[in-house]
Every structure is written in C-alpha cells, then in structure tokens.
A protein has these predicted regions:
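A surface/extracellular/periplasmic glyco- and lipid-processing/surface-interacting theme
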Residues: 2-21, 26-279
Length: 279
C-alpha cells in the first residue's frame, strides 16, 4: 500500500508494479496499490501507508496478498476475513524499517524478501490458485491494438484535485507518463518517471460514511474509460456481489471475484501488453 502524499515521495519500487490502483481517501489524498507479479529486481518498497476498506478486495481480484501499515476504522471490519490475505506491519506481520530521511508516518519501507518471509510464516501461497481468472485480458500480440474510431487522448487529467495528477502520451514509445504535484512522478529506486501502456478509469458512485470518509462500492456495474496508444474510449465494468456487511452504518456490498471489463458493445475488453494504471 503506497503512500502518495508529498511528504512520502518519491515512492520506491512502484515502477516495477504490473498494475497500479489509485483511489481517493480522506481530504482528497490518494493512495496507490501496486500489484507485482515479478519482484526479482525490486530492492525497496515504500513508503507504506494504511489500508482503506476497498483495497483488500481489489488485491483479491489478482489473487494477491495485501500488505499495509495500519488501517481506517472501516477497513478493520474486513481485515480478519480469511478470503483476504492481509498483512499489517503495524501488528508485526512483516519486517520493515523506518528511514531517517523522512518524517513519520511517511517513512515505513520494506523489501520483497520481508514480504515473502511473512507469507511463508503464515503459510500463504506465493503462487496463483489453479482456478485463478485474471481481471484483465491482454492482447496476445506485442503489436498494440489500434482503435480508429476512438477519441484522441494525449493529455489525461485524473480529476484528483489534491495531487493534480495527470498523464501525457509519448508517441515515440507509446506510453503515458505520470505527473503529480506539478512535476514528474519518479521511482526513487530507478530514478525514472512512471509510465504505463494502459489507463482504466472505473467510474463508481461516490458516497460517504457517517463521519465523512469516502465510501466506494465496487460491486454492481458501471461505465469507465480505456486509454491506450493515444486514444480513449468508453467501456463498461461489472463485479458480482458475494456478501453484504451491515456493521458500517450502511449496506456495504463486497465481492472477492474479478471486475469484468467490456467494450461498449459488451464484448470483452482486450488491453494492450504493458503496465496498467486503474483509477
């Protein structure tokens, strides 16, 4: 669970994530969740921050273990769920260090070795389940899919006002480069700016808990945007409900399964090979 407030930047290791989720929390600040399939060349991960209720369910879509440092009161309701393989550094679930070059609570870092050790100690598999079905279906060809009828998209603003995040398309390499807080977003580990092949906007109803904290229900169905190769087009998404929690002052619907993405004609969305950012 990546910190994304200015005091916690730059992040370390995030450029090696295959999928990055970005969601808004209190005060308009966003948090990032990196999903890693291969972490062999990752030497540092951080800074790590606290969990919000929707992130463990997004991690479950990828059959992934979810690592965080603390949590909101609403997220605490789900952290004991055996279907959600969560690890809380604040409870000693994995080893970490507090770096001296940043102030607390923006200075918690760890390594992939620490995370794998934590999984082994809890007897959590580091391999995908045999019946795992990935949420995203990637193009089998390395040649990107062209969409002649899609709208041109060179600069893409996320709508997150706090960090003023946006992406700019580079026609030379076909990637979208990430900016926030008025400057390029850089991985401390590599020194390189974050860049992705695909961006998906998943539009969900924005509600609030009783104390004003954001409430996002990720089940049901809705619309979104798929952005790749300099174009943007409308898509649809859907996610099945597996349960309802009534302890949070609302009927909180949740699901462990994957989000399904389709084109506007309801055929399955095929995304280009490469890293993907989901907002």
């Amino acid at each position: 669970m990546y910190n994304n407030i200015q005091a916690g930047l730059p992040q370390s290791g995030i450029s090696k994530a295959d999928v990055i989720f970005e969601g808004q929390c209190e005060g308009g600040v966003t948090r990032l969740m990196g999903v890693f399939q291969n972490y062999d060349d990752v030497t540092s991960i951080g800074s790590i921050r606290s969990c919000r209720d929707y992130y463990p369910f997004l991690a479950a879509e990828y059959d992934a273990a979810y690592f965080h440092f603390g949590q909101s009161d609403f997220a605490l309701e789900f952290l004991g769920d055996p279907e959600l393989r969560t690890f809380n550094g604040m409870n000693g679930d994995y080893n970490y260090e507090r770096r001296s070059d940043r102030v607390s609570p923006h200075n918690v870092f760890t390594t992939p070795e620490n995370l794998v050790t934590a999984m082994v100690n809890k007897k959590v598999s580091t391999y995908l389940d045999e019946d795992y079905v990935a949420p995203l279906k990637f193009n089998k060809s390395t040649e990107p899919i062209e969409y002649p009828d899609a709208d041109k998209c060179i600069t893409l603003k996320t709508g997150y006002a706090y960090n003023d995040a946006y992406f700019v398309y580079n026609e030379e390499d076909g990637l979208y480069y990430r900016y926030e807080y008025g400057q390029p977003q850089v991985d401390e580990m590599t020194g390189e700016q974050l860049a992705v092949k695909n961006i998906i906007f998943k539009l969900v109803p924005g509600e609030q808990y009783w104390n004003g904290s954001p409430l996002y229900l990720l089940t049901g169905s809705g619309i979104g945007l798929y952005v790749s190769n300099g174009t943007a087009q409308w898509i649809k998404w859907s996610k099945e409900v597996d349960g309802v929690n009534t302890n949070l002052g609302c009927n909180y619907t949740y699901g462990y399964g994957p989000t399904r993405y389709t084109y506007w004609d309801d055929s399955e969305l095929i995304v280009n090979q490469g890293k993907t950012w989901i907002c």
